[in-house]
A protein has these predicted regions:
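Surface-exposed loop/turn elements that mediate protein-protein interactions on large endomembrane-trafficking
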Residues: 51-74, 92-116, 138-166, 187-213, ...
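Repeated scaffold domains used in trafficking and secretory/extracellular systems
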Residues: 73-81, 114-126, 164-176, 211-224, ...
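Residue-level marker for isolated small/hydroxyl-bearing positions within beta-strands
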Residues: 91, 132, 181, 228-230, ...
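C-terminal region of N-terminal signal peptides and the immediate post-cleavage residues
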Residues: 31-60
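Hydrophobic beta-strand positions that form the internal "hydrophobic ladder"
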Residues: 88, 129-130, 177-178, 226-227, ...
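Terminal targeting segments of Actinobacterial cell-envelope proteins
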Residues: 1-16
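Loop/turn-rich, solvent-exposed surfaces of beta-rich toroidal or solenoidal domains
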Residues: 299-330, 353-358, 366
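Secretory targeting and sorting signals
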Residues: 16-37
Length: 407
């Protein structure tokens, strides 16, 4: 029976953006990046859910300095802050990917990845990252898959990436595995059926190849099959599909998937007034329902590395002419259903670049862009304040890898 997890009275939450980066790993799909101020840093674009009207809370002031103490600079997250954890590092993509230590500004090249003019795509996997060269622009056939590209695995604690194979697309699997999908060079992935194979992170093939349903791409390999997403959006909403190659007729669909791991799927079905987040544990079959307050919804989330919690981005319509919303990060304990606000994260939707766990630890990392600065935050559950650093262009990489997909 479903286990109903109620948020409780009166907490404010709201709509969030939906991930699209699974599509970005194919040559046919343009990588959706937008410039944000300052210093032309990049982020992956995230389409928003339908607006929900609510009364906006007080505006959030902005800013910070990278040292522990009281934030003094205008335009950013304000208040008392903590020092950045000394050992916490994040990868940065680009022509030559690097490891970046926000606490010190140290930058070290990631070994095993040759220089790539088009840059690299990073996809979060258990214990590390799947890394693949960005496809760039295909001459003569913009919708074709093009030549296959090398796939690498970069461990959270690794100094170098290890080659895992060649493919047109890569997706995370159960721990220690990746799923590689290939197409004929002249095929259009939005209509063609890709051929997928499971490999170890060292590149050893683990089983037979499977032909995917035409027009679908693997988002996540799970303990109960492959979570598939449409390669491109089409007229009308197409649900994601949990597909078992051995029993394709038994597929289950999910409307509005917001996060997935090897053992859990979270989704937020379309709603009008009272929205819910559903979480299915694929190992036990247990389904939980997290109720959001009235007039709020959600469109993006991330499971913690150990699977014990789900962080959701909640947003509110503020009825402004530019369509911006107030957003806030909330952590849901999947054991108790308790919802905890991540402190100091009430900002405009335009300010939140991304969030996730760039290492297998309890530290949730988020990136924010304000008018005069970009801030990187770290939060450990139970802490009453954030650790914050200001990312200055002359001392930090341009494209940090924060969320599930980055390029």
């Amino acid at each position: 029976m479903p286990d109903i997890l109620s948020q409780g009275g009166g907490r404010e939450t709201g709509p969030w953006p939906r991930r699209v980066a699974a599509v970005a790993v194919l040559a046919l799909v343009a990588v959706l990046i937008v410039h944000y101020l300052p210093q032309s840093r990049h982020r992956t674009a995230r389409p928003a859910r339908a607006a929900v009207t609510v009364t906006p809370p007080p505006a959030v002031s902005s800013a910070v300095s990278g040292d522990a103490g009281v934030v003094e600079e205008p335009d950013g997250i304000t208040g008392r802050i903590l020092s950045w954890p000394g050992g916490l590092r994040v990868p940065a993509t680009g022509e030559r990917p690097v490891w970046f230590w926000p606490a010190t500004g140290q930058v070290v090249p990631i070994g095993g990845l040759p220089p790539q003019r088009s840059g690299y795509q990073f996809t979060r996997a258990a214990g590390g990252w799947a890394v693949q060269a960005d496809p760039g622009t295909q001459a003569g056939c913009g919708s074709c898959a093009g030549p296959q590209r090398a796939v690498y695995f970069l461990a959270d604690s690794g100094r170098s990436a290890t080659r895992a194979g060649l493919a047109d697309a890569v997706a995370p699997g159960v721990p220690g595995t990746l799923w590689l999908t290939s197409y004929p060079t002249d095929a259009a992935p939005h209509t063609a059926a890709g051929v997928a194979r499971e490999v170890s992170i060292a590149g050893r093939q683990l089983g037979p190849q499977f032909r995917l349903p035409a027009g679908y791409l693997i988002e996540q390999g799970t303990s109960r099959g492959l979570l598939l997403v449409p390669v491109t959006s089409r007229a009308g909403k197409i649900a994601d599909k949990l597909w078992d190659p051995a029993a394709p007729q038994a597929s289950r669909t999910f409307d509005g998937v917001i996060a997935a791991s090897a053992t859990q799927i979270a989704w937020s079905p379309s709603c009008v007034a009272r929205c819910r987040v559903q979480v299915l544990n694929l190992t036990t079959g247990r389904q939980a329902s997290v109720e959001l307050p009235a007039a709020s919804s959600v469109a993006n989330a991330a499971f913690s590395p150990n699977g014990s919690s789900l962080v959701i981005q909640v947003s509110f319509s503020d009825n402004t002419t530019n369509g911006a919303r107030a957003v806030q990060l909330e952590r849901v304990s999947l054991a108790s259903g308790r919802l905890t606000t991540v402190p100091q994260t009430w900002v405009s939707s335009d300010a939140l670049i991304g969030f996730g766990w760039p290492a297998s630890s309890d530290n949730l990392v988020a990136e924010f862009s304000f008018t005069t600065k970009v801030q990187l935050t770290s939060w450990r559950p139970g802490a009453s304040r954030l650790a914050i650093v200001v990312l200055r262009p002359q001392h930090s990489p341009a494209s940090l890898v924060i969320g599930q997909h980055s390029s």
